[in-house]
Amino acid sequence: MAEKIDIEASKNEDFNKLKLSDLNKRLHTIYQGGGEKRMAKLKAEGKMTARERIDALLDPKSPRIEIGAFAADGMYKEHGGAPSAGVVVVIGYVSKRQCIVVANDATVKAGAWFPMTGKKNLRAQEIAIENR
């Protein structure tokens, strides 16, 4: 009986590791924003990415969490996709005060808004209001 449980637990662990690996691959793609080409163009112009701008604003080594990285995942394929709905939202600390920061991602359709972009911005505002 214990052997059967161990085999089942091992199968579950392998399944979960595979799913976690898939999620991490998807996140890596999402973090590329509009793609390597657009990221390179942004860098050539001397600009920072949305995530870099947020990191520069937030207190160093302070806790932070990104909200909605998977927003619009798989949507708007006819437009080339909209990773993170074209906007990065992070809860973090500025001058030791917790806040929510929103930055448009210029690498995603030059910062154009999609319907999910508006929803994500509204959700960021709701979170800020709920946690005043």
Language-model-derived ranges and their functions:
Residues 1-132:
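Terminal-region recognition feature
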